[in-house]
Structure formats: structure tokens, C-alpha cells
Amino acid sequence: MASVKEHYDNLLASCYSWMCGGFELKLKKNRAFFQDHSIRPAHSATAVDLGSGSGFQAIPLAEAGFKVTAIDVSRDLLAELNKTAGKLPIRTIQDDLLNFAEHSPAKIEIFTCMGDTLTHLKTPAEVEELIHSVYRALEKEGILILDFRDMMVELTQLDRFIPVRSDSKRIFTCFLEYEKCHVKVHDIFYEKIDDQWKMKKSFFRKLRISSQWAKECLLKAGFKVEKYDIENGMITMIARKR
């Protein structure tokens, strides 16, 4: 089984932005999300984007006026972010997101951990560790935004085959196997090169996180949960340090 980093290096990074619907579409959605929820600088104007990928959160945050530290394990996705960000105030760091304190500014107004990044952690204990560490690092009235997939209900039989995205030259599908605490995600990517289809395949584990448990972790750490929503299988929470 590949680690998260190996899975992205070997397969996912090369097609990630396309797989997610396209870079500009994701930027548009997150710009609207941050605007709709009044996410703009009010104090130190510093943000840390955990699992930043190619910049779906970091770029809109920087456009809104934040100085952003973007952390991800994928060198290729960070390179894509740097290329797209131009002169925006974004600093990229290649590291495990649990090590964010080693790279963060002294004052932090907002953390984002979106795009299903939270499920990439290995254990519930790591999730709790991250939430408590973020709480300690945030300045007063600081915000944490979580966005992750609800995988508590098991898909069965053929429903475990997910057609993610396809076009005339690329096809991305995945197959899910459920374990007690994790889901094994088997990704299969076909790409047409010189009139021949080439296949890449890899799998890794995602952590199954219930929305209620995640909310309880936030409250236990000291956060006030200001938004709690489930839409199209994605759980979104906005929590504020009290």
C-alpha cells in the first residue's frame, strides 16, 4: 500500500486539479465560499492552509488579503501552486501538515484544512492532535475551517465503483473497500497518449471520520462551532477560538 505522499507522487498529483473539476472552477467555488462566510482579514491577516494541494484555498485567501503559508507533502502540487500564484503573498512548504508549527508565523488568524485533507491522517488520535495544536496556535477569535468527506455509510457491491471524471483523453475512476476505521481508495487513471491508452493505478487509506465526532473534538479543544453543514457527502465546519 502506498503512503499518502507516494500515492500523490505516483498518480494523483499529475491529474489532481483536473480530477477535481478544473483549477478555475475550484477557485471560483472557494472565492464564493470565503465571501459568503465573511472570511477576510480582521486581525493579523495570516493564514495557514493545511494540505494546500495546488492552491484551491491558498489563492483565494491571498486574494482576500491574507498572507498564506501553504503546506503539503506533494512537491508537484506545490510547484503548480507557485506557478499559478504569481506575486500573491503565498509561502509554500513541503512537509507533513502535522508539522505545521515548525513553519508557521507567531500569530495566525485562520487555518484551513479542506478538500478532504483531514481523512488523509492515519488515526483519530492524529485528528485530535491536529485540532488541539491548531487551537493553541490560533490567535483569539481565530478560525479553523474543516471540509471532509462523510464515509461512515458503506457503499456496497457495484456502488463502490465511482466514475470521478472523464473526457476524450482522460478517465479517472476509483473503487472503495471499507475497513473498520478506514476506506481503501483504489484510484485508476487512464490517459490517451499518441492514440494509446496508458493506465496508472494506486491505492491508499483514508480515515473514516464521523461528523458528530469531529464536532465533539472541536468543542473539546475549546472551539465554538459556527457552521456545521453536510452537502453532497461533504462535511463543512467553521470553528472559532473562544
Q: What are these model-derived regions, one by one?
A:
Residues 102-110:
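A short acidic, Gly/Pro-enriched loop at the edge of an enzyme's catalytic core
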Residues 128-140:
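A short glycine-rich, Lys/Arg-flanked "PGG" loop and its adjoining helix->strand segment in the class I
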Residues 109-125:
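A short SAM/SAH-binding and catalytic strip from SAM-dependent methyltransferases
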Residues 125, 145-213:
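SAM-dependent methyltransferase
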Residues 213-242:
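C-terminal lobe and adjacent flexible extensions of AdoMet/dcAdoMet transferase-like proteins
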Residues 55-100:
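Class I SAM-dependent methyltransferase SAM/SAH-binding core
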Residues 1-53:
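Conserved class I S-adenosyl-L-methionine
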